[in-house]
Curated annotation (Swiss-Prot):
Homotetramer. It catalyses: L-glutamine + H2O = L-glutamate + NH4(+). One of its GO terms (biological process) is glutamate biosynthetic process. This is Glutaminase. Keywords: Hydrolase. Belongs to the glutaminase family. It is an enzyme of class 3 (hydrolase). HAMAP family: Glutaminase. SUPFAM superfamilies: beta-lactamase/transpeptidase-like (SSF56601). InterPro entries: Beta-lactam/transpept-like (IPR012338), Glutaminase (IPR015868).
């Protein structure tokens, strides 16, 4: 496995320079584009890494999975009264569908859906940002994970569209807390800094029927785990989820920080990171690396 990871990174490295680092969040635009890392964590505790797997990066929309899990843990099936679990087929920050469907987001991984989930968690936790930070520290086994306040502030200064979505949902009665307070939590969740190693470990419960592979803690039930994985498979890569299913064949979640996490149910979790994105907002080299890895080991669930 170790040799394979190194070989795959060598194969995809020529793609660096063909994508574009996210620049609509200024703090992300400054990230050096020539970085590439991958980490694999097994249900048996085995761990492999290559490249810049220990380098911290902004998780961005990958945090939406953590938020969803917190909401499911507290609210169970009741959360689906406020949002769906269907693919959107629209850009992650689109408002057209949200208006047409009267403020009920299609799924928890588009921005509107993630904001509803944050609204749910805002009602539950006294200090949502600290609750999220402590949750990911526990999942990853890394007590040093922090929020990058510069990235969070940068997002807040360029978050008008997210605010518009929140107020639109509030007008339909599907947003209960103060919009600014929820946005503050949301931007801080996205600004969590983690490495490929951290994320592969943190997602291990999704490959292990809801139980963390490194701590033994039950995070979700087996049924809830299948539900989260199914939403990742259909909606986890913005409007490129179908292409990811075709090429990689695994549940996954990406972020505009350049990270992608993929789950091999019953076996492994994988995180790859390269900051340059393709036109859909997903890591260009990361997508190819996961495609090659899945193909060579036969990991596709299809």
């Amino acid at each position: 496995m170790q040799a394979m990871l190194s070989s795959i990174l060598d194969e995809v490295r020529p793609l660096i320079g063909l994508g574009k680092v996210a620049d609509y969040i200024p703090a992300l635009a400054d990230v050096p584009a020539n970085q590439l890392g991958i980490a694999v964590y097994g249900n048996d505790g085995s761990a492999y890494r290559a490249g810049d797997a220990d380098t911290l990066f902004s998780v961005q929309s990958i945090s939406k999975v953590f938020s969803l899990v917190q909401a499911i843990d507290h609210g169970g099936e009741t959360i689906w009264e406020r949002l769906g679990h269907e693919p959107s087929g629209q850009p992650f920050n689109s408002m057209v569908q949200l208006e047409f469907e009267r403020g009920r987001p299609r799924n928890p991984f588009i921005n509107a859906g993630a904001l509803v989930i944050c609204d749910i968690n805002q009602s539950r936790f006294a200090v949502p940002i600290l609750s999220m930070r402590d949750f990911v520290r526990r999942l990853s086994g890394n007590p040093h994970i922090l929020v990058n306040s510069v990235v969070a502030e940068s997002e807040a200064q360029h978050g008008a569209r997210n605010a518009a979505m929140a107020y639109l949902m509030k007008s339909f009665g599907n947003f209960h807390n103060d919009v600014d307070a929820v946005l503050h939590s949301y931007f801080n969740y996205c600004a969590l800094q983690m490495s490929c190693v951290d994320l592969a470990k943190a997602f291990s419960f999704l490959a292990n029927e809801g139980t963390s592979a490194h701590s033994g803690e039950q995070i979700l039930t087996a049924r809830q785990t299948r539900q989260v994985n199914s939403i990742m498979a259909t909606s986890g890569l913005y409007d490129e989820a179908g292409n990811f299913a075709y090429r990689v064949g695994l549940p996954g979640k990406s972020g505009v920080g350049g990270g992608i996490v993929a789950v091999v149910p019953g076996q492994f979790t994988v995180c790859v990171w390269s900051p340059e994105l393709n036109a859909a907002g997903n890591s260009l080299a990361g997508m190819k690396a996961l495609e090659l890895l899945s193909e060579r080991i036969g990991w596709s669930v299809f």
